[in-house]
């Protein structure tokens, strides 16, 4: 599934939710950071098959500048992968940014 998400993101087959736009401004995460992270060495760390707006997953990745990001997105079976939210994970709440403490 990770490869399918990366493939869609790399070919522009994704969209941002209003929530992610609002939250990235508040959290000082640039849109280009989200785009580069989702297309790089990303890893699905949590799966939400029963999410209320449709199946989604939490992806961990690192930007080109080395910033860790968590990106929640829809499953790639939609025509466009929807980026739901993105944030820099708190190292005190995550082990290696991949496992919840």
Where are the regions that the model predicts?
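Ribonuclease/tRNase effector modules and their secretory precursors
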Residues: 1-101
């Amino acid at each position: 599934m990770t490869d399918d998400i990366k493939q869609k993101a790399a070919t522009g087959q994704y969209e941002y939710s209003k929530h992610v736009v609002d939250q990235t401004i508040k959290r000082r995460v640039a849109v280009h950071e989200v785009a580069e992270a989702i297309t790089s060495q990303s890893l699905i760390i949590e799966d939400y098959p029963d999410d209320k707006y449709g199946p989604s997953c939490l992806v961990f990745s690192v930007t080109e500048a080395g910033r860790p990001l968590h990106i929640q997105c829809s499953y790639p079976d939609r025509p466009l992968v929807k980026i739901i939210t993105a944030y820099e994970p708190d190292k005190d709440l995550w082990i290696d940014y991949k496992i919840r403490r």
